[in-house]
Amino acid sequence: MRATFHLFTFIFLLLFSSVICISTPGFRNDHESIGDDEEKTSSTILVSTIDGRLRALDSETGEIKWTLQEEPVLRSPSAVKQGFTFLPNPLDGSLYVLKNSSLKKLPFNIPQLVHASPCKGNDGILYAGSKKDVWFGIDPKTGLKVETLSSASADRICPANQKQTIFLGRTEYRVSMFDEKNRGKTWNATFNDYSAHLLPEVNTWPFKHYASSSHGYILTFDRETGEMRWEQDLKQPVVALYLLRDDGLHKLPFEVMGKETMENVAKNIFTVDQWPTVLGVNAADPQTTSLTNQFFPALFVGESSFGLYAIEALVDHQTITYSPKLLGPPLLEGPAPIALTEMEKEEYLPPRRPIIRNIPPSITHKTSDGEYLLLGYHDRPMMTMATIIPTRYPVPGPHKAIGSTIERPPPQLLGPVEPQKHEDTSFILLLLNNHPIPFYATLVTMFALLLTVIWQCGRQWDQQKSTSRMDSFEIVNNPGESRSAQTSKQSNRGSFGWANRKIEIPEGWMAVGSKLMYSPSDILGTGCEGTVVYRGTFDGREVAVKRVVSEFVKFAHREADLLRESDTHPHVIRYFCMESDSQFRYLALELCIASLNDYVEQKEVQQNVTIALRDIMKQATDGLAHLHASKIVHRDMKPQNVLITMASQRGEMRAVISDFGLCKRVQPGKNSISRGIASGLAGTDGWIAPEVLISASTSYPVDIFSLGCIFYYVLTSGTHPFGKSLHRQANIVNGEYTLNKLADLDDWSLADDLISSMLNVEPLHRLTADAVLNHPFFWTSEKRLAYFSDVSDRVEKEEDNSPVVRRIETDARIVVCGGWREKICDALKEDLRKFRTYKSFSVRDLLRAMRNKKHHYRELPEDVRQSLGDIPDQFLHYFTSRFPRLLLHVYKATEYCSGEAVFKRYYSDDVRARMYPIVEEEERVRKKIKEEMANEVWARAPKPVEQRTPLKLDKRNIKKKSNPNTD
């Protein structure tokens, strides 16, 4: 109760002193006549973002009052040119140059270049610039632009209220750079800046602002209490903060931080012990903070809709920064390190941060010469020693006579010089000079009230702070730390989506969302457009975390959507979840032991893989067939995208299709994908089907072509059917390939036929995925023997001139190698003579012999069984090794019977659809021939003799005719 009483007393006295101060003469400005009902401009801050928007925010709540759209603060190229790439800073116009994939800071900024232009650098670069100033008046309540003043013209949109209109000055700087030796190298940029009064000291503003380097997040804290006052998301990077006053803009200080660093700050803002040391608020000397011990300066390289840019930002030790490659050993020996104990290192030295030095994981922009630019956080670059020499000199004054000698000053070098120190004009001194009486009255009243209230309310105040403190999402870096020390109340605040749960993150790992984390140092693979795959965990399960640059978020979402629909199949990689942060999208996928490329190239991988090579090929085809049945075209089939999973509890491994980033869905009612701007050329050189390059549309056969290349690559231990990589794509377009290395395989004829059908130049003549699965190359020994028996039964009673027999007996001498009796062993040859006669040149008789010996295998003599071997593998190998073309020949011949019930399991639907009109036509012709032959036989047959009956004469009529006069 006493604390409450004193609190009310404090508020009453504070209001009383404020009334006295306001009523004091001289407190109000002479020109101020705005009523009490109108909103004061001093409570409004303007936030400028890179897209050119000026947003008026309430300084107490962060609520957006109005928005004014202007030209973008920065416009710069998005392309990277070899040795001629510059990155401007939208905060102050400073410049960074990219050379040899390394960033350096130039000692001058865009405004300085414009003031010095035209000028020339010592590196042969020519600079030209221009400057345009403009004033525009706005209504501070609505943000409406009411008047524009410039040297060219003056436009008034509506009648200006001189009492309320505030004029803002804006300067547009345009700079162009040209290579003296190469006119093709040019660079242009436009930088807009607002004229503003500088606040004299940082501690005069009661708030401390933090802005994200890549997004428009703003966090605002009370400088004294450390309480977070408000947060706002403006969607675009913040470049400047201003206090809107009657006399114009007053620039406000703010810190730029990395997005992840701001998230870490949000996790600790209510921790009493860490808060003052982290941000330096509520400290004895606010100017002297411990930011240098907790955060590290870095350079953020980003890309907006208006071009590339670079902003210096503070990051913590968990943020990965890129460091330029070391080009060589140091020429001079460096100083000896200072010997420090481990305790001294922990106290005085900042923690080590992970730095990527050798492998650029996300090459976002790359030139043909190999120079690349990485988007993300870089070590703060060193300043170059580049200088520029102005070419303009002062014009002589009027007192100089014509023809007199003009003393020209030497050219000034604009380069890395010592920065000038400006005397700070304190904001408190401004108040003291302009309004001394209310200032002193307020100061004395506040001091007295603080002394009388703080000592009585100290304990209650501490308790109130402790009970109102909320802990956000907790990250435990040390799993061994006691649980009781880590337990705290959790909060739902924080605009970064921290979940109310606790996860343990191993040292060096990073968390994304509430369940997903990964190890940045454990890279499993890299892909195009900056894609990197890390080892990670999802909800305790080991997974592969695929990180995609946010610029390609469309592809990441499409990949996730397609995986959700297709990952139920055992041979499509499993998808778990997708998370995101400021720069990347993260996909949690099934963790695999190796890719098919690793299996072929690395022998140690083959030793750890228990699945057979032919099973890998068949399972990959099965996964692709599932995609095609789901109307999905993969478009990037290659050995790197066929993965082998970890062994299951039963020790089984699987082959799965992965990387759905380039997949496209065939729209309903269509059979192909048009090659427009959205589709583009998809795939990897050397594995792209020819129609992708020369046709306006593509479809499922593009995957079959790539799969055929993969089959040959796997069966030949790393050889490509279209030759070396240099001429590979040209050979693909021309249809020039060789399969000669398949001759070393036992099933060389089957492999040759399968791959040749998959690599056909005509897409419509290639096999479908189902036809590939039904090809005899993938049949087991049991299925092959059963097929031979079914064919023998089918043609046993057929006539010699029947269509199927004629097909089987075509080129029979080649199939049976001149005579199959000469190729079998003597024991089997002798046994065959005992029962019936076999024709040595007949494929049908060879199939009959195989069928009979299989059915009567146990009745065969011992020597014959030993020669044939066990059923099915050795028995089948006995015949196929002697007649390697037999299975393929019979398979092609009996396509005629693919529609019959017995043979449906051996052929795919597309084979039956292809053979149906052929069979129908053949049967129609045979039926017609039979009818014609029957008619011809009937016509040639002898006719039976016609039996005629003799005529019977009427004797009575004869008599009458012979005796007419009888009467």
UniProtKB/Swiss-Prot annotation:
The kinase domain is activated by trans-autophosphorylation. Kinase activity is required for activation of the endoribonuclease domain. Its cofactor is Mg(2+). It comes from Caenorhabditis elegans. One of its GO terms (molecular function) is RNA endonuclease activity. Its EC number is 2.7.11.1, 3.1.26.-. The chain crosses the membrane at residues 439-455. This is Serine/threonine-protein kinase/endoribonuclease ire-1. The gene is ire-1. Residues 518-778 form the Protein kinase domain. Disruption phenotype: In combination with RNAi-mediated knockdown of atf-6, causes sluggish movement, arrested development at the L2 larval stage, and lethality soon thereafter; larvae have intestinal degeneration and develop many vacuoles in the intestinal cells. In combination with RNAi-mediated knockdown of pek-1, larvae have intestinal degeneration and develop many vacuoles in the intestinal cells. RNAi-mediated knockdown restores fertility, reduces the accumulation of unspliced tra-2 in the cytoplasm and suppresses germ line masculinization caused by RNAi-mediated knockdown of rnp-4/RBM8A. One of its GO terms (cellular component) is endoplasmic reticulum membrane.
